[in-house]
A protein has these predicted regions:
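Substrate-gripping "pore-loop 1 plus following alpha2 helix"
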Residues: 98-103, 131-165, 210
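A short beta-strand-to-loop transition that corresponds to the Sensor-1 phosphate-sensing loop
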Residues: 121-124, 147-154, 164-176, 192-193
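Conserved RecA-like P-loop NTPase ATPase core
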Residues: 53, 85, 133, 145-148, ...
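Conserved AAA+/SF3 P-loop NTPase catalytic/coupling segment centered on the Walker-B
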Residues: 115-146, 174-185
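Phosphate-sensing "switch" segment of ASCE/P-loop ATPases
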Residues: 15, 159-168, 175-254
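Pre-Walker A (Motif I) flank of P-loop NTPase domains
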Residues: 63-68, 114-116, 166
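P-loop NTPase catalytic core of nucleic-acid-dependent motor ATPases
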Residues: 10-95
């Protein structure tokens, strides 16, 4: 018998929360606002990486979401970026696991992954399920046929399992030699490990223990972003200059 993953309950949004979320979404300086909220939550620097991770999680709602692999040496800050981004996303929009077995994704409910964020803190945790993840990213769905026996007659029969995507994948890794095919389907981000960034992190950690840096507003900021995510609706986008966009033709990946 397949145990289903229990989806978190979606809290009822108050009028105050809704207005705050709409104010965020209609801010002409939305991207700087997002960066400021990351900083308010204690994550310094990494401006480009912050925006890429945030937008990749928003892309879960698109027909072909982005996937991100955050790479760094141990204790260099990849997990901080990973956690800070997910805290801005509604709990019901994400599935977080430490590891996946080879066929675990096939036995989820049909729509349990659809337009969700699949987050695994270390790439090694998905090594057994890498084939399923590649299929999910390239085809947007999974299907599995399993041979079983009928309990009453003992006759063989085939059971079919189908799981619909798409899904946005968020991973971290310390390895340079991970699954190349999986990495090819992700945007690989390198965390800043320069001394200046380390010094800024140390300063932020010291400030966190002062009265002004106690972080009392952090939960308010997270709630505002989560409510904003719940208000997002699908809208068509037209790029007037799309025909003028060009890319290198001597490489298939950049």
């Amino acid at each position: 018998r397949v145990a289903r993953h229990r989806q978190p309950d979606v809290p009822v949004m108050t009028e105050l929360e809704r207005n705050a979320a709409l104010e965020l979404l209609t801010d002409p300086q939305l991207l700087p606002h997002i960066l400021a909220d990351y900083a308010a939550g204690g994550l310094v620097g990494e401006e480009t990486n912050k925006l890429i991770c945030y937008l990749a999680c928003v892309s879960r709602l698109l027909p072909r979401p982005l996937s991100v692999l955050i790479q760094s040496s141990s204790a260099a800050g990849k997990t901080a970026l990973f956690e800070a981004t997910l805290q801005f996303m509604p709990p019901e929009a994400q599935l977080r696991w430490s590891a996946l077995t080879s066929q675990s994704l096939y036995y989820l409910g049909r729509d349990e992954l659809k337009h969700k964020i699949l987050a695994v803190a270390e790439e090694e945790g998905v090594s057994e399920a890498s084939y399923a993840l590649k299929l999910l990213q390239s085809e947007g769905r999974l299907s599995l046929a399993v041979a079983t026996k009928e309990s009453d007659t003992g006759r063989g029969r085939t059971e079919h399992y189908e799981v619909e995507g798409p899904v946005a994948l968020l991973l971290t890794t310390t390895r340079d030699d991970g699954d190349g095919e999986l990495a090819n389907r992700c945007l690989t981000l390198s965390v800043n490990e320069q001394p200046e960034q380390t010094a800024a992190i140390h300063q932020r950690q010291r400030a966190a223990y002062t009265r002004d840096g106690s972080g009392s507003e952090a939960q308010v900021v997270r709630t505002r972003h989560q409510c904003a995510q719940r208000l997002l609706e699908p809208l068509g986008v037209v790029i007037p200059w799309a025909e003028e966009l060009t890319f290198r033709t001597d490489q298939t990946r950049y």
